[in-house]
Amino acid sequence: MSQENSSQFLRNRPKILLIIFFSALCVKLLIFFLATDPIVFHKYPYFAQRISEGFDIGERILDLSPLYLYINLFIYKIYGKNWEVLAVLQIFLGSLNCLLIYFIGEKILGRAVGLIAAFVLLLYGNLTVVELTLEPESFVLLFNSLLVLILIQNQAETAPTKNSWRWLLAGVVIGLAAITKANALLLLPVALVWVWQKHPSPARAIKAMLLVTAGTVLLISPITIRNYVKFQDFILLTADSGKVFFHGNGPGSTGMERADLPDQGFAEESQSEPDYAHVLFRKAARALTGRHLKPSECARFWFGYTLDYMRAHPLSAFILEVKKFFYFWGNYEVHDIDSAYKNYRTLQTWPLLPFGIISALGIVGLGLALKQFRQAFLLYAMILVYLFSALVLFVASRYRLPAAPFLAIFAACTVTSLYTQLRERRRIRLLACAGLVAALFAGTHLFFRSEIETLDRWQRATRIHYSLGGNMLFKKGLYREAIPEFAKAIELEPGFAPAYNGLGMSYAVLNDFEQAEKNFRRVIELSPGIDQGYLNLGLLYELKGEPSKALPLLEKASRLNPGNPKTKEHLQKIRAGGEK
């Protein structure tokens, strides 16, 4: 396309908007139909269905995004269990967000930057993977972009009578983002700084700041009141902040791989509720203190516990933060949802943009746009907010994702700069800029490579071969087919106890008692503090007609997990048989 034709195209705004939206929608629908498995992570749908059926989910409501839970409830009321409707809605919102990023880029750095940024974002395949997980990130990204657009528009309107309501609207959007994902509250100080520096008079600035704050409080306060009325506990939004802080900074955290309670995954598996770790953390806090802590006190306990650990290991804590900083810009995507990780691996074979190229181009763009810092302040601030959030918590893909749309704008800034240098034949600057991008791109792949490979091996073992492989096949009754999947998980991670447990149960159902016993004993060896190994080995002995061997194992399982009804049932059965 010649320069004249490209200029003419850039002037045709309606055509640009249609091309962006439908290109994004087509790419996302192709990923939805061709590269993703059926939805298997149903945390929000599960609780929405429970509430709809009249059940009180108790403290679990404090573990969930308030707005997203109610969106799920609304979808369930209309469409029932057809959760694909919500997935399609989220990729529609993702396509709409590409348009918003175009508008933001256009207003701040020019139409060409906006257009390229929109295409960078729609070709970032991992974004669509996250949009399809039935988690609230799609709505967070949408609210973030709306907030930036509103703030930019308010800057353009100087008449106080025209834009007072817009400051209130900005606060409402911050509130919507916060009741979707609590760390979005960090956007409030960003908005207040923007208001202060852009207003010509202190009096008008203070009025606008009060309106922004009022809009935010208007959305947050109903959730806070709900929490206090229901639990007699002051909880602003959710009660999982201490748990998440422990994940990112506690013993065993690597920056990408989170710290967990001992045998947490194993303990979660025996529960019917999804994402049961929240309950386990509250139980652990109450057990360690010997008091029935309120949910907010449990969160404070884990904050205190983690801070004590960090103070006791200051050098390790510092190194961890350095790692998190580099991981934030790295190419590798850390997924904490099984299906998302599998879909991410599938998309690696597609001709889409990895985060590494967006990161490398974006970092260079951050430098190139410094001369327009005041104008682009909000873009810098949005990236810094989520960098700070990742440093405080951990660098899972979902946690850094809200920075990606704004990083895409800076990436587009680099692309337009490279094009200008090429067109004007500034070879030295072109080579220097391109060389820097290439070096940064290589860095996003090479930093801490061995740790990334270790984590990816763990992800393949636990998520693909265990959760989505052997475990799912076992639940379908395909026991013989499940065995090689469990075995593959063990081959990749020999210390992963749940895979031995799955193998043992599969062999037991297939009447290979010798192999079943061998695997259950390995479970006990690896996870002596969890009841599953003792329970299953006890049940195996009971099945073999050896109640004297089963009894001590079931008693041990009962001591470890007194509330397990299956253990109680079989203990009573064996004891009743012994009394006859």
Can you name each region flagged by the protein language model?
Residues 147-167, 195-199, 373, 478, ...:
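Membrane-interface transmembrane helices that cradle and orient dolichyl/undecaprenyl
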Residues 39, 63, 67-68, 85-93, ...:
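Multi-pass, polyprenyl lipid-linked donor-dependent membrane glycosyltransferases
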Residues 34-47, 57-71, 80-84, 234-238, ...:
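Extracytoplasmic catalytic/substrate-binding loops of multi-pass membrane glycan-assembly enzymes
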Residues 25, 73, 117-118, 165-181, ...:
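Membrane-interface alpha helices of multi-pass inner-membrane proteins
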Residues 88-109, 146, 150, 360-367:
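Transmembrane-helix motifs of polytopic, lipid-linked glycan transferases
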Residues 236-323:
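Membrane-proximal stem/loop segments at transmembrane-domain junctions that anchor or position
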Residues 14-15, 96-123, 141-142, 164, ...:
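Transmembrane-helix signature of polytopic, membrane-embedded enzymes
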Residues 84-85, 291, 301-302, 308-379:
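Membrane-interface anchor segments at the N-terminal boundary of transmembrane helices
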